[in-house]
Amino acid sequence: MLDTANYTPRLKAAFSETIKAAMKEEFGYKNDMQIPRLEKIVLNIGSGAESVRDTKKAKSAQEDLTAIAGQHAVVTKAKKSIAGFRLREEHPVGAKVTLRGDRMYDFLDRLTTIAMPRIRDFRGVKPSFDGRGNFAMGMKEHIVFPEINFDKIDVAWGMDIIIVTTANTDAEAKSLLAHFNMPFNA
């Protein structure tokens, strides 16, 4: 049985033991508070056109995202009506969840060590930063996560993963994520 009182995620321990020192040496930080760290990870599934015809699809996306994240996901709703898409205001269009703390480190560990190697023809992720030290990536199928039972899903959803850091530059954020074993391809 897992002792949750004394449990520390593997990547969180690695950050405090080795990654902090490596980042401090690499960028010459004078204070430990200058060292970039992970702030949160946001997961998003947009159920798209399927949810316009059937509102249960957004609920299905929410259940799958809850299983992946280990935390309750919320259903996202349309902000305004768009007649061309047959979309009405407050209509469910997807699901999202924000991970912080230990769950964030656990998810990042599962993402880099379990889910990404299961992606077909995987050659690494493209370094996609926003200029302020935040990283975003997309996955074509959410079924690469072991929490999803392939036999019970009706749709293979695409998924957005946004990793928010306290880094000021993209170089700092890329180095931080590389220390967390993020497999960049370039």
Swiss-Prot record:
Keyword field: Ribonucleoprotein, Ribosomal protein, RNA-binding, rRNA-binding, tRNA-binding
Molecular function in Gene Ontology: rRNA binding; structural constituent of ribosome; tRNA binding
UniProt GO cellular component terms: ribonucleoprotein complex; ribosome
Transmembrane segments: none
Domain of life from the UniProt record: Bacteria
Job of this protein: This is one of the proteins that bind and probably mediate the attachment of the 5S RNA into the large ribosomal subunit, where it forms part of the central protuberance. In the 70S ribosome it contacts protein S13 of the 30S subunit (bridge B1b), connecting the 2 subunits; this bridge is implicated in subunit movement. Contacts the P site tRNA; the 5S rRNA and some of its associated proteins might help stabilize positioning of ribosome-bound tRNAs.
Assembly: Part of the 50S ribosomal subunit; part of the 5S rRNA/L5/L18/L25 subcomplex. Contacts the 5S rRNA and the P site tRNA. Forms a bridge to the 30S subunit in the 70S ribosome.
NCBIfam families found in the cross-reference section: PRK00010.1
Name of the protein described by the UniProt record: Large ribosomal subunit protein uL5
Gene from which the chain derives: rplE
